[in-house]
Amino acid sequence: MPNSTIALTFDFDALSVWFGYPNTTPAMLARGEYGARVGVPRVLDLLQIHHLPATFFIPGHTIDSFPHAVASILEAGHEVAHHSYAHIDPSTQTLDEERHDLERALDALRRIGVQPLGYRSPSADMSPATLGLLETYDFRYDSSLMADDFRPYRPRIGDRVSQQEPLVPGRLARLWELPIAFEFDDWVHFQFNFNPYRNGTSAPSKVLEIWIAELD
């Protein structure tokens, strides 16, 4: 495998990952708490062993619920970025709801001394207003979209798309896009749950094969 530059990012959703479904039974919430109790310490240990920096996208709800886990991320020197307040898909919100959610999460981040440069949308989706709001609040980058694989690009605001007419491109946003890909998301491969059903029982060796092939 040739030398590659890799951006390591972690979505520390904890309990909030279930709010958008919604599915907040004790069993599901316990699975979310696993991230704070077990997942984050193990990830931080691994990053320290290999001297790797990373970015953690953290909902405000997680910041307020698990302050010690979030503090350990900051103490280790990693970037903390915006990931909404309660992990609700922005495409399901009104403009006022989305703005309130964005501001509430910013308040949570500022309480721990973070003025975020980056944003990642919950559920890997956006409303037509999301990128414009990110500009208004002076974000430098987004990491939610998939119009490229490894190269940063500037996303567009105000595209017009319909079944009857070809794409009419909007203007370039002032912020940069650091694209994501579902095949690199461990949730897709490993998370098993009944409701909504997700058969996340992949063999780690198979997932590693996929990731190495993508990097090659």
Question: Which residues make up each language-model segment?
Answer:
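Active-site beta->alpha N-cap acidic-glycine motif
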Residues: M1-E79, G132, E209
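Short, well-ordered coil/turn segments that N-cap beta-strands
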Residues: P2-I6, H50-A54, E75-E79, R110-L117, ...
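A cross-domain feature marking catalytic cores of carbohydrate-active enzymes
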Residues: F10-F12, F56-G60, H82-A86, R120-S123, ...
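Feature marks short, surface-exposed loop/turn motifs that line or immediately flank catalytic pockets
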Residues: A14-S16, T62, I88, D149, ...
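Surface-exposed, active-site-proximal loop segments in enzymatic domains
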Residues: G20-M28, A86-D96, F190-R198
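Acidic-and-aromatic substrate-binding clefts and catalytic sites of carbohydrate-active enzymes
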Residues: G32-R37, T55-P67, I88-E98, R120-A129, ...
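An active-site-proximal "capping" alpha-helix that borders the catalytic cofactor pocket
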Residues: E98-I112
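Active-site-adjacent pocket scaffolds in enzyme catalytic domains
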Residues: R110-V114, R120-D216
